[in-house]
Amino acid sequence: MMDINEIREYLPHRYPFLLVDRVVDLDVEGKCIRAYKNVSINEPFFNGHFPAHPIMPGVLIIEAMAQAAGILGFKMLDVKPADGTLYYFVGSDKLRFRQPVLPGDQLILEAKFISCKRQIWKFECQASVDGKPVCSAEIICAERKL
């Protein structure tokens, strides 16, 4: 398990773009992670998406999955951004949205390592709310030394 202070050691993102609140399961040997994002009506994106019917933007759900995958990648390599390594989101495959994410939801983020070739990492990711899938994708990240 990782609290927000440890998460901040493994992700360079900060408010309002840090989209992982807690890691509840991390298995480096099994190459998988489970984390969550508490979605509050106070999120800045709800001011414009959409004021009368607030829905979490899909691109931010994708970003939240990518951040969870990034934590897994850092842990698998046993490095942190402070060590001079970053992961950049470079793409996704097999992306599907299944239902909207609303204020008050707890977004569960799961990522499993698929492969790494020439510092290009691929993860199978899923986001769910109340046990129901809301988004799935293969997330592709590039590992870069600073």
Curated annotation (Swiss-Prot):
Keyword vocabulary terms for this entry: Cytoplasm, Lipid A biosynthesis, Lipid biosynthesis, Lipid metabolism, Lyase
InterPro entries for the chain: FabA_FabZ, FabZ, HotDog_dom_sf
Q: Which GO terms describe its molecular function?
A: (3R)-hydroxyacyl-[acyl-carrier-protein] dehydratase activity
- Identify the enzyme class: lyase
One Pfam family name from the record? FabA
Give Gene Ontology CC terms: cytoplasm; membrane
Q: Where in the cell is it found?
A: Cytoplasm
Which reaction(s) does its UniProt entry say it catalyses? a (3R)-hydroxyacyl-[ACP] = a (2E)-enoyl-[ACP] + H2O
The highest taxon in the source lineage is Bacteria
Residues at the catalytic site: 49
- Biological process GO terms, please? fatty acid biosynthetic process; lipid A biosynthetic process
Gene3D superfamilies (UniProt xref): Hotdog Thioesterase (3.10.129.10)
| Record EC number | 4.2.1.59
Q: What does this chain do?
A: Involved in unsaturated fatty acids biosynthesis. Catalyzes the dehydration of short chain beta-hydroxyacyl-ACPs and long chain saturated and unsaturated beta-hydroxyacyl-ACPs.
Q: Which PANTHER family match?
A: 3-HYDROXYACYL-[ACYL-CARRIER-PROTEIN] DEHYDRATASE
The UniProt family comment states: Belongs to the thioester dehydratase family. FabZ subfamily.
Query: What protein is this chain from?
Result: 3-hydroxyacyl-[acyl-carrier-protein] dehydratase FabZ
The organism's lineage?
Bacteria, Pseudomonadati, Pseudomonadota, Gammaproteobacteria, Pseudomonadales
